[in-house]
Amino acid sequence: MSSSTKCKKAYEAVVKMVTHRFNSKAVRNYHQPQGLNRSLATRNAARVRGMVPSRRGGVGLYKSSSSKLMNKLGRQKTWINEFEHFNSLHEIAYTPNIALSSEIQKYLKALETNYRSIYEKSSELLDKKLEEIDKKWIEKNGCIPDASKDDVEKNLRKQYLADVQDVKNEHIPVMNCEPGGSQFKYLCKTIELLSSNKTICFAIDVEAFEFDTDIVTEIGIAIYDPRENIYSLMPIIRSYHLIVAEALPLRNKKFVCDFKDCFLLGESLVLPLEQCVEFIQSLINFYMKCETDQDTTWERAFVGHAIAGDIKWLKKIGVHVPELDNELTKPEDSTESKGVRKHVKMLDTEKIYSMCYGKKGSSLGKLLRLFHLPHAFLHNAGNDAYYTLLLMLKLGDYNFRKQIGADDLETMGYRIREWFKREADEPKILPMSYVLSVMNANNSKPKVDDKGRKKPRDLVPQTEFSGSHWFQNARAAFKSTLV
């Protein structure tokens, strides 16, 4: 058998395995590390360091824990101040960079002029295309169909609206961001907040159980604090991946792959639901609320991809969220006194993308690819929060936008359209080393050489994971991330 035929057969075998959503015995054996306690292994759960083997999980236990939840920290308390480094951050005030601010304002002024020109040309061209549609309809049917209860008229109206929508979908550039409008102001404010390096960014991502979306299985958090990055060449980003212990054995498999044990940025923290809430609340109370006069000089923002859903999930499990500024329109109070809460901004990567390029292709994975951000194992909450934060930092960096031509909406539109075409024409890429390693892992008999000696297995995937660690309380889990 030729090597190409072997590779083809191996590829087909793994595609078949993936199609079965990790339900085949071969993939389960490969996916799970050795040494699992039996009760969790039967549920496809990952090995967790330090976890009592007899500890149980499941839908019933999750809902029981959820019904008894008590958020002990409330809206203000945080034990993160007990750690010297973090407590010292309260004494750092934001110092405006006059030269940088001038460059940002110059960029925003040019952006408004550019977008206004693009909007006028795009609208004029789209109007001509729509007039042509109307003309063809009148020639063919005598008139433009109005809304009617008559079935024939109703079907004609439906077809007409579909033709209009097709023209709008194919039109480039998509312009949802007219200068002077609320969306353009949101875009400009986002760029100003991030480019000036004065905003503490708190990115969140929540994964739920697809067979009961009231059950939160993972929470990912990634934090960029400019107070820690004043003198940094490489940005310091603090990433956390929380796995709800009661939901540990619950695996998604119908709509998305379950990658809860594939966190790339450290060790996953497995905590009881109540302690997950305490962990999140302590971070929010520290980063998103002001305690000192110096604190009030910084802006604060939650970051997410379609973030409203993640905020809703946090509230559902009992997390107290500060008052939010969804549209970035609430006035800033420069005279705010010590301890008084400022509105926390909401920065949404999906919203920014849709404003500039339209709603089509707005998934996180597609945006990461479009803006050249390496990524893997999406739908792990910790990974997604980290990627979303990086994406937002790029979208809000005026210099990055200039370098990649993000504001050339026509060129970006054709680039996005090209990706859609390639997706339709090209197969998904699955690394051959992963294909063969899965096949090797399923071999019941080891390979031997001509002398009967066992051959070492090769083509081991090189992605390294730190695994998961059980903690009884949130404070101990947080402390473990500082080492």
From Swiss-Prot:
Cysteines paired by S-S bonds: none
| Record bears the keyword Ligase | no
A cellular component term (GO) from this record? nucleus
InterPro entries linked to this entry: Gfd2/YDR514C-like, Gfd2/YDR514C-like_C, RNaseH-like_sf, RNaseH_sf
Q: Which GO terms describe its molecular function?
A: nucleic acid binding
Q: List locations, semicolon-separated.
A: Nucleus; Mitochondrion
Print the keywords alphabetically: Mitochondrion, Nucleus
Segments traversing the membrane: none
The miscellaneous remark of the record is: Present with 125 molecules/cell in log phase SD medium.
> Which PANTHER family does the UniProt entry name for this protein?
GOOD FOR FULL DBP5 ACTIVITY PROTEIN 2
Q: What is this protein called?
A: Uncharacterized protein YDR514C
